[in-house]
A protein has these predicted regions:
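C-terminal segment of classical bacterial N-terminal signal peptides
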Residues: 1-9
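An alpha-helical, amphipathic repeat domain used for nucleic-acid recognition
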Residues: 8-114
């Protein structure tokens, strides 16, 4: 059953929230994202152009496992370039990179390095 804006079980959920959630799931189907990275992509003028509130709603409700996303991102990096373990962690948690938390970046890099 599709989520309806008028549904009493989802009071306060806007059409923008629903559309942002659909786009978040689409993005996650082909690329790894951190929570902050996904919000940034969704609210970017070059991405989804959703409001920060809509983008945040989508990231909170998309069902992503952020540790698993960090592993996926780490493996993506290792498939195209060489990194030290610490360099990979830095790339994953960088404000200019993937924006994972330090814990998520460390988890992802260590799992990908195995």
């Amino acid at each position: 059953m599709a989520l309806s804006v008028a549904s009493p079980a989802h009071a306060g959920v806007t059409r923008g929230d629903i559309e942002a959630l659909a786009q978040a799931k689409s993005y996650l189907s082909f690329k790894a994202f951190s929570f902050k990275g996904l919000v940034g992509q969704l609210d970017s003028p070059y991405g989804g152009q959703f409001s920060v509130a809509e983008a945040t709603y989508a990231a909170q409700h998309c069902g992503a496992n952020w540790n698993a996303q960090a592993v996926r991102a780490a493996k993506e990096y290792l498939s195209i370039s060489s990194f030290s373990l610490n360099g990979l962690i830095s790339q994953l948690d960088s404000a200019y990179g993937d924006k994972f938390t330090v814990a998520q970046a460390t988890y992802g890099a260590r799992k990908a390095y195995k």
